[in-house]
From Swiss-Prot:
Key words of the record: Ribonucleoprotein, Ribosomal protein, RNA-binding, rRNA-binding
Annotated gene: rpsD
Ribonucleoprotein as UniProt keyword: yes
Lineage, broadest ranks: Bacteria, Pseudomonadati, Pseudomonadota, Gammaproteobacteria, Pasteurellales
Protein name: Small ribosomal subunit protein uS4
GO CC annotation: small ribosomal subunit
UniProt function note: One of the primary rRNA binding proteins, it binds directly to 16S rRNA where it nucleates assembly of the body of the 30S subunit. With S5 and S12 plays an important role in translational accuracy.
GO biological process, any: translation
One MF term in the entry's GO annotations: structural constituent of ribosome
Originating organism: Histophilus somni (strain 129Pt) (Haemophilus somnus)
């Protein structure tokens, strides 16, 4: 599947917030002007219409999880089909992606790096190699680094970096073993308050 390969910080500047596309070793505002959009007229902040705000929110979430438009729309359709709040369902589906779980557990410094680990067969789920980044992790699934991949310096560095941030409460991680358990489905209160999923629902409901 095609992926965006351009400058990562430019995307964060476009959305005006940290999309966590970089490792987090340094605060993003020390690397770039996060409150200034890229381009010659980046300092100007145009007033957005309702549609513009909805579109920006969708783009922001899509870029956070590194998903292209067609796949994101499919996630929305599935979220809308499920019982409950469509917006919350959407976020739960995105959080349940294997590449995201690998990132959340601290085995990778970014979601892009996590996606690469999965694609390169460095991750096992319940003892079996899974190389599909979009694989949906279920409750009680055990996600671990493959034995022959445990010596990778980047994985060790990512785990050290993960110690500096709070791990999600719906995951249980044993860093020494390089494995973790998807204990429960995250609730909305567990997830970022910086995301307004209602705008995305409004956009796709038109």
């Amino acid at each position: 599947m095609a992926r965006y390969l351009g400058p990562k910080l430019k995307l964060s500047r476009r959305e005006g917030t940290d999309l966590f596309l970089k490792s987090g070793v340094r605060a993003i505002d020390t690397k770039c002007k996060i409150d200034t959009a890229p381009g010659q007229h980046g300092a100007r902040k145009p007033r957005l219409s309702d549609y513009g705000s909805q579109l920006r929110e969708k783009q922001k979430v899509r870029r956070i999880y590194g998903i292209l438009e067609r796949q994101f729309r499919n996630y929305y359709k599935e979220a809308n089909r499920l019982k409950g709040n469509t917006g919350e369902n959407l976020l739960v589906l995105l959080e349940g992606r294997l590449d995201n779980v690998v990132y959340r557990m601290g085995f990778a410094a970014t979601r892009a790096e996590a996606r690469q680990l999965v694609s390169h067969k460095a991750i096992v789920v319940n003892g079996r190699v899974v190389n599909i980044p979009s694989f949906q992790v279920s409750v009680n699934d055990v996600v671990a680094v493959r034995e022959k991949s445990k010596k990778q310096a980047r994985i060790k560095a990512s785990l050290e970096l993960a110690e500096q941030r709070e791990r999600p409460t719906w995951l249980e991680v044993e860093a020494a073993k390089m494995e973790g358990v998807f204990k429960r489905v995250p609730e909305r209160s567990d997830l970022s308050a910086d995301i307004n999923e209602h705008l995305i629902v409004e956009l796709y409901s038109k």
